[in-house]
Amino acid sequence: VAYHNNSYTYYNRHLTHPNLGYDYYGQGNGLNLTVPGWPYSDLDMMEQTAPAYIEDYVNTGKPFHAYYMSVSGHANWGWGNAMSAKNREAAVAAYPNASQPVQGYIAANLELEYALTYLLEQLEAAGIADDTVICMTADHYPYALVTDEVDYYQELSGKQDSELDISRYKNTWLLWSGSMESSVTVNTPCSAIDILPTVSNLFGLEFDSRLMSGHDVFAQNYNASQAST
């Protein structure tokens, strides 16, 4: 099942997601959000959706796969942004000396933090956090923080880079399970296309690696020079 708290037809996701095998729900197609304003609330989406598949797993033992596409952190990050406004007090208290755009960005993205907090609480309450894997990544750096006058991304990241630096376009992939005994950091260069083969191997799934462009980032024979760019 897949969820997106924006218009379900945007970018034709109502066509692509079913072709990927998902039962897809978005605004206008079965996802009924209660918090008004743009961008919409990730916490609201999680509260409306997670209890059903968690309860089903507890009752039947049937594994679930839920795909979420977040929208709460979407630009722009003035106080007119619904999520920035919703979490303004917390962001300003945490970063009182930050510029307004940076405060607004943090405030908007706190909504995803709250959504994940809620999800983990529900998984732990159901006793299945140790049997759950969460895979999370982003699509791009917050380029809307860059204006003609000020590069607020430098303030946010603490790096004196520019849009011409490759380092700005590096991303992070978070893979978590409640059963992890300790954290693992992988510094091997990799790309989004490496996620599927890596997770497939961790789950012990059989697949033809010739049909996947990526590599398992934990593989001992991983050649970083072949990483996708």
Protein language model features and the residues they cover:
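Solvent-exposed soluble domains appended to multi-pass membrane proteins
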Residues: 1-229
